[in-house]
Amino acid sequence: MLLEYIDEVYKSVEKIKATQIKNIQEAAMLIANSLLKEEDSVFHVFGCGHSHMAAEELFYRAGGLACVNPILPSELMLHEGALKSSYYERNEDIIKLIFDRYDLRQGECIIIVSHSGRNGAPIEAAIEAKRRGLKVVAITSKEYKQKTFSRHSSGKFLEDITDIVIDNCGHYGDAVLKIKKDTLEISFSPLSTVLNTIILNMIEAEIVSIMIKKNLVPPVFLSGNIEGADEHNLKLIEKYKKRVKHL
């Protein structure tokens, strides 16, 4: 089954290449332009449950941009209680309290990652972000809207609210492999984290490319395990530490 999983990854990545490049390029351009407005401009990344790893993937990353502000509320992560995180992911009322902890500025961009796009917290995050004047990019699976209902009081899905939607080309239920034997039928091996991570790094790669074309030096962290990295990285940390809460 291990090779079948890789094959499923390839299938979805090829679908992303075939259908989502324009959306990814538009998202990168939107974010890049927002970063040029102020010397300390950042963009924000938010996700619930396992989707919070999207924010961690881009944050303080070797080869990644320093101007990334991850929104990492423990209530919506797994390490302080998986059941609690599932409860709060469906709760739209918590978002304003969470956003008040972070420096979110009008004209900046936020990437919201939700595989299902149906739960209260990520949908409310998009609504609240737009209310505060941010542009919203969503990474989600469009299959869910075709097969289930929204859990937000508005009845809307994440893709209905955002400025740019990127379909991660993942599947309803996330698991992509199946075994059926006698009366036993199991679906297993999720794809969403792999696909979301690929898309996020595609966005960052395009942002860096846009900055270089504008004769700017992208604020990219070096790996802490190569010589000279500490001095380079500390300069970037000094520049963004007032904007990036978790630095």
UniProtKB/Swiss-Prot annotation:
Signal sequence bounds? none
Gene Ontology terms describing biological process: carbohydrate derivative metabolic process
Which Pfam families does the record cross-reference, listed alphabetically? SIS_2
* Gene Ontology MF annotations: carbohydrate derivative binding
**The SIS domain, residue ranges:** 31-213
Please give the family membership noted in the entry: Belongs to the UPF0309 family.
PANTHER family in the record: PHOSPHOHEPTOSE ISOMERASE, SEDOHEPTULOSE 7-PHOSPHATE ISOMERASE / DNAA INITIATOR-ASSOCIATING FACTOR FOR REPLICATION INITIATION
UniProt-recorded name of the protein: UPF0309 protein Teth514_0240
> Species lineage, top-down?
Bacteria, Bacillati, Bacillota, Clostridia, Thermoanaerobacterales
